[in-house]
Amino acid sequence: MEISEKQIEKYLVKKIKAEKGLCLKFESPGYTGVPDRIIILKNKPVAFVELKRPVGGRYSARQKLVERDFNRLGQKVYKVKNKEEVDKLVEELI
């Protein structure tokens, strides 16, 4: 059975909370295409995460543009589409 984006998101939140961090939903009225989550861990850089379902999850043109804007400002947008990628991301961030 295919895992949903929502299930991946819940897993990410759980993993970050286990590290005593915050995994905040990122919504920006008036500025579309922002990443889904902001991760804040003690004494670590802030991380922005875009989640997609494993099969058929596609990034919109607007999301790609926003990612370029973030990169231009020295910020990385992490993209994850399954639990294994969440695990790798958490290991990288901690």
Task: Please give the residue ranges for each predicted region.
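Catalytic phosphate/metal-binding cores of nucleic-acid and nucleotide-processing enzymes, i.e., regions
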Residues: M1-I94
